[in-house]
Protein backbone atom coordinates (compact mmCIF):
# COMPACT_ATOMS: atom_id res chain seq x y z
CA UNK A 1 0.00 0.00 0.00
CA UNK A 2 1.51 3.31 -1.14
CA UNK A 3 2.26 6.33 1.00
CA UNK A 4 -0.06 9.09 -0.23
CA UNK A 5 2.05 12.22 -0.76
CA UNK A 6 0.32 15.18 0.90
CA UNK A 7 1.06 18.06 -1.46
CA UNK A 8 -0.93 20.48 0.70
CA UNK A 9 1.24 19.81 3.74
CA UNK A 10 4.54 20.06 1.82
CA UNK A 11 3.32 23.29 0.17
CA UNK A 12 2.22 24.74 3.51
CA UNK A 13 5.58 24.20 5.18
CA UNK A 14 7.39 25.69 2.15
CA UNK A 15 5.07 28.72 2.22
CA UNK A 16 6.03 29.40 5.84
CA UNK A 17 9.64 29.83 4.66
CA UNK A 18 8.44 32.11 1.85
CA UNK A 19 6.47 34.19 4.36
CA UNK A 20 9.68 34.77 6.36
CA UNK A 21 11.47 35.70 3.14
CA UNK A 22 8.78 38.29 2.29
CA UNK A 23 9.06 39.78 5.81
CA UNK A 24 12.85 40.03 5.38
CA UNK A 25 12.47 41.77 2.00
CA UNK A 26 9.98 44.23 3.51
CA UNK A 27 12.64 45.21 6.05
CA UNK A 28 14.78 46.13 3.04
CA UNK A 29 11.81 48.15 1.71
CA UNK A 30 11.07 45.65 -1.05
CA UNK A 31 7.43 44.57 -1.41
CA UNK A 32 7.19 41.57 -3.77
CA UNK A 33 4.32 42.02 -6.22
CA UNK A 34 2.70 39.63 -8.69
CA UNK A 35 0.39 40.92 -11.43
CA UNK A 36 -1.97 38.38 -13.00
CA UNK A 37 -3.81 39.08 -16.27
CA UNK A 38 -7.04 37.14 -16.81
CA UNK A 39 -8.85 37.36 -20.14
CA UNK A 40 -12.42 36.14 -20.44
CA UNK A 41 -14.63 34.15 -18.08
CA UNK A 42 -13.20 30.60 -18.18
CA UNK A 43 -14.34 29.01 -14.86
CA UNK A 44 -11.18 26.88 -14.39
CA UNK A 45 -8.96 29.93 -14.99
CA UNK A 46 -11.02 32.01 -12.54
CA UNK A 47 -10.58 29.32 -9.89
CA UNK A 48 -6.79 29.09 -10.48
CA UNK A 49 -6.45 32.86 -10.25
CA UNK A 50 -8.39 32.98 -6.97
CA UNK A 51 -6.05 30.34 -5.56
CA UNK A 52 -3.00 32.36 -6.60
CA UNK A 53 -4.36 35.58 -5.05
CA UNK A 54 -5.23 33.87 -1.78
CA UNK A 55 -1.81 32.18 -1.52
CA UNK A 56 -0.01 35.47 -2.24
CA UNK A 57 -1.97 37.29 0.47
CA UNK A 58 -1.25 34.53 3.00
CA UNK A 59 2.51 35.09 2.73
CA UNK A 60 2.25 38.90 2.68
CA UNK A 61 2.91 39.39 -1.02
CA UNK A 62 1.05 41.99 -3.09
CA UNK A 63 -1.12 40.50 -5.81
CA UNK A 64 -2.87 42.49 -8.51
CA UNK A 65 -5.49 40.99 -10.83
CA UNK A 66 -6.23 42.68 -14.15
CA UNK A 67 -9.43 41.31 -15.73
CA UNK A 68 -9.93 41.86 -19.44
CA UNK A 69 -12.94 40.96 -21.61
CA UNK A 70 -12.80 37.96 -23.97
CA UNK A 71 -12.76 40.29 -27.01
CA UNK A 72 -9.57 42.14 -25.92
CA UNK A 73 -7.32 42.68 -28.94
CA UNK A 74 -3.87 41.08 -29.03
CA UNK A 75 -2.30 44.53 -29.52
CA UNK A 76 -4.02 45.83 -26.35
CA UNK A 77 -2.71 42.90 -24.31
CA UNK A 78 0.83 43.35 -25.66
CA UNK A 79 0.68 47.06 -24.84
CA UNK A 80 -0.42 46.26 -21.26
CA UNK A 81 2.48 43.78 -20.85
CA UNK A 82 4.88 46.44 -22.15
CA UNK A 83 3.59 48.83 -19.47
CA UNK A 84 3.97 46.22 -16.71
CA UNK A 85 7.50 45.37 -17.93
CA UNK A 86 8.42 49.01 -17.34
CA UNK A 87 6.71 49.23 -13.91
CA UNK A 88 9.42 48.77 -11.26
CA UNK A 89 6.85 47.94 -8.55
CA UNK A 90 5.77 44.78 -10.45
CA UNK A 91 8.19 41.86 -10.00
CA UNK A 92 6.24 39.05 -11.64
CA UNK A 93 3.83 39.04 -14.60
CA UNK A 94 1.58 36.06 -15.24
CA UNK A 95 -0.88 35.80 -18.13
CA UNK A 96 -3.40 33.08 -17.27
CA UNK A 97 -3.60 30.47 -20.04
CA UNK A 98 -5.42 29.40 -22.16
CA UNK A 99 -5.98 32.61 -24.11
CA UNK A 100 -8.88 33.33 -26.52
CA UNK A 101 -8.25 31.89 -30.00
CA UNK A 102 -7.59 35.26 -31.66
CA UNK A 103 -4.55 35.92 -29.43
CA UNK A 104 -1.18 34.30 -30.25
CA UNK A 105 0.02 32.62 -27.04
CA UNK A 106 3.68 32.56 -28.14
CA UNK A 107 3.69 36.30 -28.89
CA UNK A 108 2.30 37.00 -25.42
CA UNK A 109 4.84 34.76 -23.63
CA UNK A 110 7.71 36.30 -25.64
CA UNK A 111 6.49 39.82 -24.71
CA UNK A 112 6.99 39.32 -20.95
CA UNK A 113 10.40 40.56 -19.79
CA UNK A 114 12.52 37.47 -18.91
CA UNK A 115 13.31 38.96 -15.47
CA UNK A 116 9.54 39.06 -14.72
CA UNK A 117 8.69 35.69 -16.31
CA UNK A 118 7.63 33.95 -13.08
CA UNK A 119 5.82 31.20 -15.04
CA UNK A 120 9.17 30.14 -16.55
CA UNK A 121 7.75 29.94 -20.10
CA UNK A 122 9.89 32.57 -21.88
CA UNK A 123 12.46 31.13 -24.34
CA UNK A 124 15.25 32.72 -22.27
CA UNK A 125 14.05 30.86 -19.15
CA UNK A 126 13.58 27.61 -21.09
CA UNK A 127 17.05 27.91 -22.67
CA UNK A 128 18.71 28.49 -19.32
CA UNK A 129 16.85 25.52 -17.84
CA UNK A 130 18.10 23.34 -20.74
CA UNK A 131 21.74 24.13 -19.95
CA UNK A 132 21.24 23.95 -16.18
CA UNK A 133 21.74 27.69 -15.54
CA UNK A 134 19.86 29.40 -12.66
CA UNK A 135 16.54 30.77 -13.96
CA UNK A 136 12.81 30.84 -13.23
CA UNK A 137 11.77 27.20 -13.50
CA UNK A 138 8.23 26.36 -14.69
CA UNK A 139 6.03 26.04 -11.61
CA UNK A 140 4.43 22.59 -11.98
CA UNK A 141 7.66 20.75 -12.99
CA UNK A 142 9.62 22.48 -10.21
CA UNK A 143 6.82 21.66 -7.75
CA UNK A 144 7.02 17.98 -8.77
CA UNK A 145 10.80 17.92 -8.31
CA UNK A 146 10.46 19.56 -4.90
CA UNK A 147 7.79 17.03 -3.82
CA UNK A 148 9.96 14.07 -4.85
CA UNK A 149 12.99 15.50 -3.03
CA UNK A 150 10.89 16.29 0.05
CA UNK A 151 9.86 12.61 0.21
CA UNK A 152 13.58 11.67 0.18
CA UNK A 153 13.23 9.71 -3.06
CA UNK A 154 16.64 9.09 -4.70
CA UNK A 155 16.78 10.60 -8.21
CA UNK A 156 20.32 10.18 -9.60
CA UNK A 157 20.58 7.00 -11.67
CA UNK A 158 16.84 6.25 -11.39
CA UNK A 159 14.62 5.73 -14.43
CA UNK A 160 12.05 8.51 -14.75
CA UNK A 161 9.27 7.94 -17.30
CA UNK A 162 7.26 11.02 -18.29
CA UNK A 163 3.90 10.42 -20.00
CA UNK A 164 3.04 13.66 -21.83
CA UNK A 165 5.09 16.17 -23.81
CA UNK A 166 3.41 19.54 -23.23
CA UNK A 167 5.51 22.70 -23.08
CA UNK A 168 4.08 23.44 -19.62
CA UNK A 169 4.71 20.13 -17.82
CA UNK A 170 5.90 17.13 -19.85
CA UNK A 171 8.96 18.48 -21.66
CA UNK A 172 10.33 20.65 -18.81
CA UNK A 173 9.77 18.11 -16.01
CA UNK A 174 11.88 15.55 -17.89
CA UNK A 175 14.63 18.13 -18.29
CA UNK A 176 14.64 18.98 -14.57
CA UNK A 177 15.04 15.30 -13.65
CA UNK A 178 17.74 14.91 -16.32
CA UNK A 179 19.58 17.83 -14.69
CA UNK A 180 19.42 15.78 -11.45
CA UNK A 181 21.16 12.84 -13.23
CA UNK A 182 18.09 10.65 -13.73
CA UNK A 183 17.67 8.54 -16.88
CA UNK A 184 14.59 10.01 -18.58
CA UNK A 185 12.17 8.46 -21.10
CA UNK A 186 9.34 10.45 -22.72
CA UNK A 187 6.07 8.80 -23.80
CA UNK A 188 3.13 10.34 -25.70
CA UNK A 189 0.11 9.50 -27.85
CA UNK A 190 2.29 7.93 -30.57
CA UNK A 191 4.25 5.67 -28.16
CA UNK A 192 3.76 2.10 -29.43
CA UNK A 193 3.40 0.12 -26.17
CA UNK A 194 2.80 2.56 -23.34
CA UNK A 195 2.55 -0.11 -20.64
CA UNK A 196 5.92 -1.62 -21.60
CA UNK A 197 7.49 1.81 -21.04
CA UNK A 198 5.68 2.80 -17.85
CA UNK A 199 6.49 -0.56 -16.21
CA UNK A 200 10.19 0.39 -16.37
CA UNK A 201 9.73 3.55 -14.32
CA UNK A 202 11.18 3.99 -10.84
CA UNK A 203 9.46 7.40 -10.91
CA UNK A 204 6.40 7.70 -13.17
CA UNK A 205 5.11 11.20 -13.99
CA UNK A 206 1.79 11.37 -15.85
CA UNK A 207 0.55 14.63 -17.40
CA UNK A 208 -1.80 14.06 -20.34
CA UNK A 209 -5.34 14.89 -19.22
CA UNK A 210 -6.85 11.44 -19.87
CA UNK A 211 -8.79 10.13 -16.85
CA UNK A 212 -7.52 6.82 -15.42
CA UNK A 213 -5.11 6.26 -18.32
CA UNK A 214 -2.59 4.51 -16.06
CA UNK A 215 -3.85 1.26 -14.55
CA UNK A 216 -2.22 -0.92 -11.88
CA UNK A 217 -0.77 -3.38 -14.43
CA UNK A 218 1.17 -0.50 -16.05
CA UNK A 219 3.10 0.32 -12.87
CA UNK A 220 6.27 -1.32 -11.59
CA UNK A 221 5.91 -2.53 -7.97
CA UNK A 222 7.28 0.07 -5.49
CA UNK A 223 7.40 2.84 -8.13
CA UNK A 224 6.79 6.48 -7.14
CA UNK A 225 3.77 7.76 -9.11
CA UNK A 226 3.19 11.48 -9.69
CA UNK A 227 -0.24 12.25 -11.17
CA UNK A 228 -0.43 15.71 -12.75
CA UNK A 229 -3.75 15.19 -14.56
CA UNK A 230 -6.80 17.18 -13.53
CA UNK A 231 -10.00 15.86 -15.13
CA UNK A 232 -13.64 16.33 -14.18
CA UNK A 233 -15.61 13.07 -14.29
CA UNK A 234 -19.22 12.95 -12.98
CA UNK A 235 -18.65 16.23 -11.15
CA UNK A 236 -15.52 14.93 -9.37
CA UNK A 237 -11.87 15.79 -9.94
CA UNK A 238 -9.77 12.78 -10.94
CA UNK A 239 -6.23 12.37 -12.23
CA UNK A 240 -4.69 10.44 -15.12
CA UNK A 241 -3.94 7.48 -12.80
CA UNK A 242 -6.43 4.93 -11.49
CA UNK A 243 -5.67 5.99 -7.92
CA UNK A 244 -7.21 3.23 -5.78
CA UNK A 245 -5.77 0.36 -7.83
CA UNK A 246 -2.32 1.89 -8.40
CA UNK A 247 -2.06 2.75 -4.69
CA UNK A 248 -1.83 -1.01 -4.03
CA UNK A 249 1.24 -1.37 -6.28
CA UNK A 250 3.23 1.86 -5.91
CA UNK A 251 5.44 2.86 -2.95
CA UNK A 252 4.27 6.50 -3.12
CA UNK A 253 1.53 8.29 -5.06
CA UNK A 254 0.13 11.82 -5.32
CA UNK A 255 -3.66 12.23 -5.04
CA UNK A 256 -5.85 14.46 -7.23
CA UNK A 257 -6.73 16.96 -5.89
CA UNK A 258 -4.21 17.76 -3.13
CA UNK A 259 -1.03 16.42 -4.72
CA UNK A 260 0.84 18.45 -7.31
CA UNK A 261 -1.63 21.40 -7.49
CA UNK A 262 -0.67 23.14 -4.20
CA UNK A 263 3.02 22.92 -5.17
CA UNK A 264 2.43 24.70 -8.50
CA UNK A 265 1.16 27.85 -6.78
CA UNK A 266 3.92 27.62 -4.15
CA UNK A 267 6.61 27.64 -6.84
CA UNK A 268 4.95 30.64 -8.49
CA UNK A 269 5.28 32.51 -5.17
CA UNK A 270 8.91 31.33 -4.89
CA UNK A 271 9.69 32.68 -8.39
CA UNK A 272 8.05 36.04 -7.64
CA UNK A 273 10.13 36.45 -4.46
CA UNK A 274 13.30 35.60 -6.42
CA UNK A 275 12.31 38.22 -9.02
CA UNK A 276 11.92 40.84 -6.27
CA UNK A 277 15.44 40.30 -4.89
UniProtKB/Swiss-Prot annotation:
Gene Ontology molecular-function annotations:
methenyltetrahydrofolate cyclohydrolase activity; methylenetetrahydrofolate dehydrogenase (NADP+) activity
Pathway linked to the protein = One-carbon metabolism; tetrahydrofolate interconversion
Which Pfam families does the record associate with it?
Answer: THF_DHG_CYH, THF_DHG_CYH_C
E.C. number, please? 1.5.1.5, 3.5.4.9
Reaction(s) the record says it catalyses: (6R)-5,10-methylene-5,6,7,8-tetrahydrofolate + NADP(+) = (6R)-5,10-methenyltetrahydrofolate + NADPH; (6R)-5,10-methenyltetrahydrofolate + H2O = (6R)-10-formyltetrahydrofolate + H(+)
Q: Which InterPro entries match?
A: Aminoacid_DH-like_N_sf, NAD(P)-bd_dom_sf, THF_DH/CycHdrlase, THF_DH/CycHdrlase_cat_dom, THF_DH/CycHdrlase_CS, THF_DH/CycHdrlase_NAD-bd_dom
Query: Is-annotated flag, keyword Lyase?
Result: no
Q: What keywords were assigned to this record?
A: Amino-acid biosynthesis, Histidine biosynthesis, Hydrolase, Methionine biosynthesis, Multifunctional enzyme, NADP, One-carbon metabolism, Oxidoreductase, Purine biosynthesis
Biological process (GO) annotations?
L-histidine biosynthetic process; methionine biosynthetic process; purine nucleotide biosynthetic process; tetrahydrofolate interconversion
Which residues are listed for NADP(+) binding in this entry? Answer: 164-166, 189, 230
Q: Give GO cellular component annotations, separated by semicolons.
A: cytosol
* HAMAP family hit by this protein: THF_DHG_CYH
The entry describes its oligomerization and partners as: Homodimer.
Q: What does this protein do?
A: Catalyzes the oxidation of 5,10-methylenetetrahydrofolate to 5,10-methenyltetrahydrofolate and then the hydrolysis of 5,10-methenyltetrahydrofolate to 10-formyltetrahydrofolate.
Family per similarity comment: Belongs to the tetrahydrofolate dehydrogenase/cyclohydrolase family.
What protein does this entry describe?
A: Bifunctional protein FolD
Q: Which organism is it from?
A: Exiguobacterium sibiricum (strain DSM 17290 / CCUG 55495 / CIP 109462 / JCM 13490 / 255-15)
Q: Which gene encodes it?
A: folD
